[in-house]
Amino acid sequence: MCGYQVRIHDMPSEDRPRERLLKHGPGFLSNAELLSVILRTGSKDENVVSMSSRILSEYNLKQLSQANISQLTKIRGIGPAKASQIAALFELARKLEIFTDDPKRKIRSANDVYSLLYPRHRELKKEHLTALYLDTKNNIIKEEVISIGSLNANIVHPREVFKSALMESSASVILTHNHPSGDPAPSREDIAVTEKLVEGGKILGISVLDHVIIGDGRYVSLKEEGYIS
């Protein structure tokens, strides 16, 4: 049993995180209070502030941001609903970073792609084909998951990749997907999909700069391997 058992509704209004946020703004709240606003409710043994404080004493924000749903639900007091709220929070934060004027969002090499996506891809149980849409200076203007599941040239259609490229006036595209096995070596289907999309890009005047396959702590660039000229 936790020592701090006062229910949120029994706390003075000026001490409740949501009311404090509304009155003073989010910058006035501690990390535990901000997390409690996201989680909304605690358990029968802990109010949400106490629960949030405990979680952040056991896991830092970086660890929480990198945890998948399965890992989050192993935390005491966190079920599927709360795990989904936490995962959605950090995914929004990651998407926001794409639109900031951050030099890390300029793609200069395949290693930049790997550094950006590996923290999210390393725990995925299925292949996720992701497109990074770039402007003329190779800054990311949009990131989009195109398909989930094993790549197949008959399933992945160029229009799914280039629809957003045209809508965003993207100058070029970088493809990336993960190999849950941990081995980033390209399969014949990986190469076939890449060749199909490169040809589709040529027709539309949108360059496919690379296809980066992410494995366990390593990656393969199909550009560097000579599959994309």
UniProtKB/Swiss-Prot annotation:
GO molecular function: metal ion binding; metallopeptidase activity
Origin species: Methanococcoides burtonii (strain DSM 6242 / NBRC 107633 / OCM 468 / ACE-M)
Annotated Zn(2+) binding sites: H177, H179, D190
GO biological process: proteolysis
The keyword Nucleus appears for this protein: no
Keywords, sorted A to Z: Hydrolase, Metal-binding, Metalloprotease, Protease, Zinc
Domain MPN: from-to ranges: 106-228
Top-rank taxon, per record: Archaea
Coiled-coil features, chain-numbered ranges: none
Motif JAMM motif, residue range(s) on this chain: 177-190
Family as reported in the entry's similarity comment: Belongs to the UPF0758 family.
CDD domains on file: MPN_DUF2466 (cd08071)
Protein name: UPF0758 protein Mbur_0382
